[in-house]
Every structure is written in structure tokens, then in C-alpha cells.
From Swiss-Prot:
The keyword ATP-binding does not apply. Plays an essential role in the inhibition of host immune response. Prevents the establishment of cellular antiviral state by blocking interferon-alpha/beta (IFN-alpha/beta) production and signaling pathway. Interacts with host IFIH1/MDA5 and DHX58/LGP2 to inhibit the transduction pathway involved in the activation of IFN-beta promoter, thus protecting the virus against cell antiviral state. Blocks the type I and II interferon signaling pathways by interacting with host STAT1, STAT2 and STAT3, and mediating their ubiquitination and subsequent proteasomal degradation. This is Non-structural protein V. GO terms for biological process: symbiont-mediated suppression of host cytoplasmic pattern recognition receptor signaling pathway via inhibition of MDA-5 activity; symbiont-mediated suppression of host type I interferon-mediated signaling pathway. It is found in: Virion; Host cytoplasm. Gene3D superfamilies: 4.10.80.340. Residues 57-98, 144-172 are annotated as: Disordered. One of its GO terms (cellular component) is host cell cytoplasm. It comes from the Viruses. Zn(2+) 1 binds at H170, C189, C214, C217. Belongs to the paramyxoviruses V protein family. GO terms for molecular function: metal ion binding.
Amino acid sequence: MDQFIKQDETGDLIETGMNVANHFLSAPIQGTNSLSKATIIPGVAPVLIGNPEQKNIQYPTASHQGSKSKGRGSGAKPIIVSSSEGGTGGTQIPEPLFAQTGQGGVVTTVYQDPTIQPTGSYRSVELAKIGKERMINRFVEKPRTSTPVTEFKRGAGNGSPRPDNPRGGHRREWSLSWVQGEVRVFEWCNPICSPITAAARFHSCKCGNCPAKCDQCERDYGPP
């Protein structure tokens, strides 16, 4: 009997293992089955089963995000990231992928080469590499003919959240997402006096020198 695992079998084993893990992680945890009361030493049952047996472990919904859990529970806990951009202002873009023309941005799709169809457990990884290469070639800076844009380097300067630009201008921003095997890109313009944020946001000019539109974002608003 051959005891060595072939390369094509490795992907199937990994995929099977991930499917099993996802099955158990997605299944709700029943509190009544989480502990066996018959095996617990008398006297310590209230401590061990007090929290898990009160109710099933529930993941927070959208209305409960940001709330802190009281006490300690068992099992996996969702990671809740507290917002650190509360004071940055601007209007957050709720779902950039479904933005329509006229909202100040444009959605494009980086289609994959139909002749390249990776298979197996690493299919998404290979497709992501292809999408990355196409995005790099897609967003090549072109010579600008009108509104100047200040070059921005994260971490440079005196740490001011707003780069100095007495003439005003716009900064092009992108939100990249991987959706059903395709790379979708939402792009829009923000005034260069606005802060750089991790979330996709529309900002208004604070310095009074930035134009309402530039040569890059004129097409974002559709025909005049």
C-alpha cells in the first residue's frame, strides 16, 4: 500500500477538512448539550453550567454590533472591532459595490481571462493573484491636464491628518472587493484636505480651495 499522499489528493483532503470545520463552526451551539451534568462533581455545577446553560450562544446581529458582552462565556467569540474613525467626519459609503452612477463614484469589474481557470483548493488564491496583477495594470497613473493632485505618502510629514495644499485638489480613492470570482472596484474622489480613512467615505472640502469636480471625477456623475 502506498503510504505517500499524492499532490492532487492533498487539495481534496484540505478542502474536506475545511468543509468539516465550517460545518461545525456555522452550527449553533446548544446550551443543554454543551456539558454533561452527570459527569460534574456536586457543588461545582452552578459555576460550570451557569452561563452556557442559561441560553444558546448567539452571535450579535447588526443592531448589537459594538456592544460588550457581560461575563465570560464558552465557545468561540466573534471579533468586534471598535470604530476608531468616529471623529473623521464624512459620509460612509454603505455598500460601494452597488453604488449607481450619479452618486459620485463609478463601479468597474476586473474580469478574469476565460482561458485561465484554476481548480482545486487554491482556486481562489490563484484568481486573487490574477486579479491583483490586472488591478496593478488597471490603475496606472495618467498625466493630468487640469487640477493638481498632491502626492501622498502614508506616514510621511509631521503626522498631520490633512496634507498641506494651498491650491486645493482631489485625491482618487478605491475600494476593492472579491465577489463571486471577480474583482469589483469602486472608485471616487475626495478633497485632498480630507483625512485618509480605512472605510470608504465621501468627504467635503474643509480648506475652501478644493474644486467641486476635477478631470478625474467628472465621469463619476454621468452626462451633464
